[in-house]
């Protein structure tokens, strides 16, 4: 699970490609999603719902990914013709610029248009990914929302150690930290720490830094990530929560959904999640659609 569930919606992206299996392509729904994002039984329920609405049967081909950039590369190269995908907001923005998406069909059988019920704030956040003439809400709506922060084991780390992202560079934690293998999260965390004084003095904002890919900023990120290397036990996309529950790592820069899973599974080893992370250290919220 990548993030904590706060909102429910859908992104519909019909991509070009070929389909060579026996089923007629129009009766196959191909979904590309994060692991743990759809509960057991939902796919079967949807097949039944679809038949009730249309009188036709549909087969679902469901695949998962754990890194946004891998998902995007697979789609860009035309290896698959997915109907529904669930990338993070910055990938939605790229896909829209590259004309990889089609507008959501809001007229389906006897179903109401649920997009009319999307909260104005959420629609506004999605539309920021597009342009006034081509708002992203035509192509995407929010499905998951969450943050990145630090999961820690209280047997080895105290909450007072976690005043800022600087704790990740503390030599006491050499070889005991797991980092999320997600480019944007690692990049953003390192840049927020590198520019912490500018943030504190109001010369720059978190959203500005999270989208700053200037040569100077990339150099700063490279410098701080290299300095972090001695403390990193590994880079993980999904196994970090399990290593934390087993006490094999002391800290994990992770997504709030993974952290919540670990808390529920491993209270006996003292895993704790500081929510919210101190404002001066927190990354901006993340949205998957």
Segments (PLM) and residue ranges:
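Hinge/lid segment of periplasmic solute-binding proteins
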Residues: 72, 93-145, 159-163
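Extracytoplasmic/periplasmic substrate-recognition and gating elements
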Residues: 266-289
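Short loop->beta-strand "edge-of-pocket" segments that line small-molecule binding or catalytic clefts
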Residues: 167-185
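C-terminal motif of bacterial Sec signal peptides marking the signal peptidase cleavage site
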Residues: 14-17
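Ligand-binding pocket segment of bilobal, Venus flytrap-like solute-binding proteins
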Residues: 179, 186, 190, 198-274
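Short helix-loop capping/hinge motifs at secondary-structure junctions, enriched
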Residues: 156-163, 195-202
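Early extracytoplasmic/lumenal segment of secretory-pathway proteins
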Residues: 19-98
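A bilobed periplasmic-binding-protein/Venus flytrap-type ligand-binding module shared by bacterial periplasmic
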Residues: 149-156, 192, 287-289
